[in-house]
Amino acid sequence: MDFEYLPFNLVTFFIFLFFVFLLIYGRRKSKRTXKINLPPGPWKLPILGNLHNMMMGSSPHHIFRDLSRKYGDLMLIKLGEFNTIVASSPRMAKEVLKTHDLSFLNRPIIQATKILCYDNSALVFSQYGDSWRQMRKIFVLELLSTKRVRSFQPIRQDEGSRLVSLIKESVGKSIDLSEKIKLYTTSMVARAAFGKVNDAGVTFLKLVTEAAEVAEGFDPADMFPSYKFLNVFFNSRSNLLKIHGKTDMILEEMIDEHIKSHQMGKKANGENGEEDVIDILLSIKDSGDLGISHWMNNVKALIFDMFSAGTETSSATVEWAMTELMKNPSVMRKAQDEVRQAFKGKKTIDESDLEELKYLKLVVKEVLRLHPFAPLLVPRECREACQIDGYDIPVKTRVFVNVWAIGRDEKYWKDPESFIPERFEDNSLDFTGNNFEYLPFGCGRRICPGMTFGLANVHLVLALLLYHFNWKLPPGVNDIDMAERPGLGASKKHGLVLVPSFYQPSF
């Protein structure tokens, strides 16, 4: 069993067990609770609940899928002190995300997001209420609206050209394509947010990646919040505070730099004279429309949101797309033929022409069916008690929707484990959350606000990689590694190493 990515190894786990049992049985008296009708689920250990199930060596979405086959599409598990339900079918997803959406609009309070996201003031992890509504309005209408995403097109084109040039330097050699893709996304997001790529921005992105890796695990301090000593024992809080201190300093400097620039009359700080995210937020503040208190922390939290969501998700999707295309050469040929036919005679791809690439978009849809970046979506928490299928769901119950399992369920998908983009031809399935068998970005009020921004990056980068290069496996490698990185995400465990050869289009 590989414990590399678990929050504790076997030795510390058993020490942890000893202290928890000692404290629980030494300090707590048994409490009588009214009997309620909870969903079915696997048997639970005293105190620990179903944590033993999470030690099975697989990622949570795999474990939950396997358990739900036995206990049903609405399953109850207990992770430490918290009851958690897992919805694993389109019908149950609809119950949680639409029928009872107002009951499940809150997020669980975990210390990683509380520390890193300025007391959960970022949009993704903030609690439902007036502040969240105002933040969402700013994010959706100002920062990442369709019009605003289009305004970032010159940045995407510029960084896309740099990506192509970078890969051309290594033609005929084995390269870690994953690293090249991440370089594009980090540079793109840095320029969109800060106006430029500099050492501070690169450092910030590394810290965001480090923070994401910490947050992806199950932290014992979050599962047993009553026992503060766990923060000392596992040192997680200390590590998070160190990361936050560094990211906060960088954001403070970037915002101060923009404030001074605005005071001097320069309202757009992008490399090509365009407004960046900080410029936009400062303009909203100056107009008096921000409508939120502690605006500096909210601005920082919004930027942190954008970086954490915009870099990892886009790069992971392109990585999986190239992985699946290498594993399915007939699909690769069809996608490349479409791109090269559509742009025949052009030295490079202009983003405005991507609408012609119908098959490429089917490929991306199929990638997100098999490899949604958030396979359990972002967890929710019940804020108003409700009933689903006759089962009682108490307040504070945590909720996962296993969209990864739903996307691979043979009840709803023919040959679900195969990569077949054509399955999306001539049907109404899209990313907007109206079809509950396909929810890579969630749905409703809590749908991913950066969906349009992320897809714009994915479509352009994938088109560039297919147009300008042919790809093969390195010498001695006969198969593609499909392993996922353990945790709450579903990115590739190992980088995608390929050998590019430059394709010279005929003019």
From Swiss-Prot:
Residues annotated to bind heme: 448
PROSITE patterns, sorted: CYTOCHROME_P450
One Gene Ontology cellular component annotation held by this UniProt entry: membrane
Entry keyword Nucleotide-binding: no
EC number: 1.14.-.-
CDD domains linked to this entry: CYP71-like
The protein's name: Cytochrome P450 71D2
